[in-house]
Regions:
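An alpha-helical, amphipathic repeat domain used for nucleic-acid recognition
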Residues: 1-237
Length: 237
């Protein structure tokens, strides 16, 4: 079973246990496995993972301190630790675990290709993750540099410009339609057109239409559709 699927199953079990235990979770171990990521060992049921970001870093640090105090006290007594969270902490921990599931799914998509924030939001929403979790996850991924609208825009432009001959204006409009901010779109276009002559793109487009036997009016109409200004089209024709 994939790790994210396993964690999803474990969280489902945890939700059931939470209902049966008057909305509190008891844990016997907390282990940090990566920066900000922890494996939680409940006293009953399978382990699950949480990221401190989703619990609230300060809140999680406080939780760790409380757990360590109980852990060392129990160890001195020779007893097995069973640290019971408050109802609020239990619900926060459950939310944090579910948010981590959304993060795992998002990272799977990002590992395959660049994503925009809007596009990734829609994909997570389609998987039925809660909007509150989605926004927290996207904030975290942006903060960590895993998610970038600028990188997405640059990658999208490289692919688009290889397959289509369009003006900068047309490409700018297409990025805006993909919910990229005006500032980010302009920045990505500056990079994409750094060594590209827009007039050369138009000239190649016109030549391709001429070779297909299109008349002047049809060529003008098609070139304008791709965002090129009429004045420049007439000049090159």
């Amino acid at each position: 079973m994939h790790e994210s699927d396993s964690n999803l199953a474990n969280v489902s079990i945890l939700e059931e246990q939470l209902e049966d235990s008057k909305n509190t979770i008891c844990i016997q171990g907390i282990k940090q496995v990566l920066s900000g990521l922890y494996k939680i060992h409940p006293t009953a049921g399978p382990v699950f993972f949480v990221r401190d970001w989703y619990f609230g870093i300060e809140n999680f640090e406080k939780l760790l301190e409380e757990f360590e105090t109980v852990f060392f006290e129990d160890r001195e007594k020779g007893e097995k630790t069973s640290f019971c969270l408050t109802e609020e902490q239990s619900l926060l921990l459950l939310d944090a675990s579910e948010a981590y599931l959304a993060e795992r799914y998002a990272m799977g998509l990002l590992n395959r290709s660049e994503q925009s924030r809007f596009l990734l939001f829609q994909k997570l929403l389609k998987k039925k993750f809660r909007i509150s979790y989605i926004n927290e996850v996207l904030d975290f991924l942006e903060c960590e540099g895993h998610l970038s609208d600028l990188r997405f825009s640059e990658a999208w432009l490289r692919q688009r410009m290889r397959s289509k001959k369009e003006s900068r204006t047309k490409l700018y409009q297409e990025l805006l339609l993909r919910s990229i901010s005006s500032q980010t779109a302009k920045q990505a276009l500056d990079t994409a057109f750094e060594d590209v002559d827009e007039e050369e793109i138009l000239r190649d487009l016109i030549d391709s239409y001429i070779s297909k036997g299109f008349d002047r009016d049809k060529i003008i109409k098609k070139c304008m559709y791709y965002g090129f200004p009429l004045k420049v089209i007439n000049t090159l024709l």
